[in-house]
């Protein structure tokens, strides 16, 4: 979904930009830069790959490795939707962890250097957000001042909508212990300046075994599904790539560690929906996030006149 106000229709330019993007960062396209890197082909990486790689490395360092684009082999081991849950052994995890870790891969000039040829990169937890930013840049280059770019639930926005109001996006209300997500809106996020909003939620994809919920987000440190208490994490940041990556990071860390990390990163605000020890749904959010929550902001003013 891309909404914008412009003198001419930009559909063709947007489509060709997305095709170029896929040729850089889509691991399922065998001709893409990332696929060639994963296949250990001799390839010079492009500017988009470089920007994503550098941002991923920065967030990996800040989060102590909770965010890690090298954990693709672990995701593959568990199988999509944990189809291989019962067959995964600690030995298998340890053997794969030998070639997982953001410190084991680096960018030198335009070349990716791997410590182990088995290292695979997967940027899915940052690339959708970056795609929003890429299209936003294109729109700005074309003189567009008001737009909203939404790709796979991640959003970059600037200016106002058709009615002249600030852009608004909804955060879905998760259902604990059911098939996942309702269409009910838990919260409205309103952005009146340029920025990115991303939500990561494991209620969409989890597996229950022996009474424990295993979330689809893998913890790179342990090699196991994160199993944290966060149902969904929404991040507001200056750009959507940053928001997207931190939303995933929060899912890995859990509520307390996520809040601690956020204190050291003033550029991001968060809204977390989590399950407490009794399985009750609760919310927590950063002080600065209140600015983007019109419904709660009004309540806060009424409660604290």
What are these regions (language model features)?
Residues 1-305:
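Mature catalytic core of soluble alpha/beta enzymes
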């Amino acid at each position: 979904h891309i909404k914008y106000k412009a003198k001419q229709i930009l559909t063709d330019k947007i489509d060709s930009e997305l095709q170029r993007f896929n040729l850089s960062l889509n691991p399922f396209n065998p001709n893409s830069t990332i696929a060639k890197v994963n296949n250990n082909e001799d390839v010079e990486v492009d500017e988009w790959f470089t920007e994503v790689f550098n941002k991923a490395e920065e967030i990996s360092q800040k989060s102590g490795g909770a965010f890690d684009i090298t954990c693709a082999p672990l995701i593959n081991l568990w199988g999509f939707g944990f189809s291989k849950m019962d067959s995964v052994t600690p030995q298998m995890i340890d053997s794969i962890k030998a070639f997982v870790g953001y410190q084991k891969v680096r960018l030198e000039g335009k070349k990716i250097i791997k410590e182990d040829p088995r290292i695979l990169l997967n940027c899915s937890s940052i690339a959708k957000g970056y795609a929003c930013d890429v299209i936003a840049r294109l729109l700005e280059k074309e003189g567009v001042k008001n737009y909203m770019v939404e790709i796979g639930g991640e959003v970059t926005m600037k200016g106002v909508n058709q009615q002249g109001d600030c852009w608004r996006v909804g955060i879905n209300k998760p259902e604990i212990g059911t098939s996942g997500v309702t269409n009910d809106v838990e919260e409205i996020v309103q952005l009146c300046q340029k920025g990115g909003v991303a939500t990561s939620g494991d209620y969409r994809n989890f597996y229950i075994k022996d009474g424990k919920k295993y979330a689809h987000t893998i913890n790179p440190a342990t090699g196991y599904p994160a199993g944290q208490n966060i149902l969904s994490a929404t991040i507001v940041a200056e750009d959507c790539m940053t928001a997207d990556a931190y939303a995933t990071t929060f899912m890995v860390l859990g509520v307390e560690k996520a809040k601690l990390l956020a204190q050291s990163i003033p550029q991001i605000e968060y809204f977390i929906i989590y399950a407490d020890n009794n399985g009750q749904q609760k919310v927590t959010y950063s002080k600065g996030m209140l600015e983007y929550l019109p419904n709660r902001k009004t309540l806060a003013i009424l409660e604290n006149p």
